[in-house]
């Protein structure tokens, strides 16, 4: 179940109204490290190979999602995606050298509903020769994007980017591009906001310790801890100081071509439970509201 063109999710780029406060939170509490900075922008990395996994740009008002960056398997994949995206109803906004410090060649596309997806190849990657810190995110695990028309959005990701449906629940389509069960998921809602971004932690213990660290900071879990059905991953959800939903996750299921996609009737829960464990905080109203408020930026600077 691999995309022939996309190998994974590299990073997300968002705006925040207070960059200094964001740096403090994401380094001292969330566990990232500053990889680079430029005027009005900070790039954060985890312990993995990616040059950065989060780019935050200072801008007034409610946070907005600038773009989601996927990594291409080859330079030739960029050519194929450019053609396939247009054939699937999308547009190509830019092709050329990357504007961020990771470098490489990029293709920037928009789907028919305006979601901005960047695909990069040849970007800088760090040597992975140091011990993994026990409580630091390694890389991004997935991003969940809301969609008012999930099946149409799913079709675009399949045709333009080569994603494959891993599982379909009543409220979400889980999209696969490599060994991780899902890299993108599409939430069945009435808007097209960013639902959340998930950061992969090295262990279940790291997910739990991270939850304690956030609670000490004054941000208790807004959902969890728990273990999902599709993906079988442990989770802890939080809303950051700016209203962005972020997740610690670990132990995501690894799948291959033999995996059979589940249907909504395959993923049901007893009354009062929406995950395998059923012991953690149920999704709060604060979380549900935050999952609808971070929209894609209409135009890049």
Where are these regions (language model features)?
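N-terminal beta-strand motif that seeds the catalytic metal site of vicinal oxygen chelate
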Residues: 1-20, 65-70, 122-151, 164, ...
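Core segments of cupin and vicinal oxygen chelate
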Residues: 4-51, 99, 145-182, 187
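A short, polar/proline- and glycine-enriched secondary-structure boundary/capping micro-motif
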Residues: 33, 66, 129-131, 257-260
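Conserved short beta-strand elements that form part of the metal-binding/catalytic scaffold
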Residues: 32-65, 115-123, 166-195, 200-204, ...
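Vicinal oxygen chelate
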Residues: 15-20, 69-113, 148-151, 199-246, ...
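Active-site-adjacent scaffolding segments
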Residues: 41-52, 57-143, 172-173
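Internal, well-ordered alpha-helical scaffold/interface segments
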Residues: 151, 155, 159, 173, ...
